[in-house]
A protein has these predicted regions:
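Short acidic, gly/pro-rich beta-turn/loop elements at beta-sheet edges
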Residues: 45-47, 78-80, 127
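Glycine-rich beta-strand-turn "strand-cap" elements at beta-sheet edges
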Residues: 5-10, 14-31, 69-76, 105-130
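N-terminal secretory signal peptides that target proteins for export/translocation
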Residues: 1-3
């Protein structure tokens, strides 16, 4: 081995030791989901109130709930899309078992005409802090 190869090997070893181990593959990836809902237009205001309470509580008390964005179509406000990001699958499962989520499901049961859940993989996510 020549001096150049030894220097490269030494630098690589130093960088590896300073950076620490690479993230383990066995760690769970974030759980990302999109929910598409159709709400009974006559109950839209009540639905939004229940959803607001659920989202605000989940963000405040569940460390594994990272993002919950609820939007409606401009020309059809009864069509709701929720973009959800959880720390991992366990955080998503814990969210489903939380008291506030169960309350939301019970409260909105007769308001939701259809629900479609779409599992997603994050490709590019960007945001600015407010």
């Amino acid at each position: 081995m020549n001096v150049r190869q030894l220097l490269i090997l030494g630098a690589s070893a130093l960088i590896s030791s300073l950076c620490g181990p690479a993230p383990a593959e066995e760690t769970q990836a974030q759980y990302v989901q999109i929910a598409e809902l159709e709400i009974d237009p006559a109950q839209l205001a009540a639905y939004k109130a229940a959803a607001r309470e659920q989202i605000e509580t989940a963000i405040r008390v569940e460390p594994g709930v990272l993002v919950l964005y609820l939007v409606s179509q401009k020309d059809n406000p009864a069509h709701i899309t929720v973009f959800e990001i959880y720390a991992d699958t366990d955080a998503y499962k814990a969210h489903l078992e939380s008291a506030h989520f169960k309350k939301y499901k019970t409260t909105t049961d007769g308001m939701v005409k259809s629900l479609k859940l779409i599992k997603a993989d994050p490709v590019i996510l960007g945001a600015k802090a407010r």
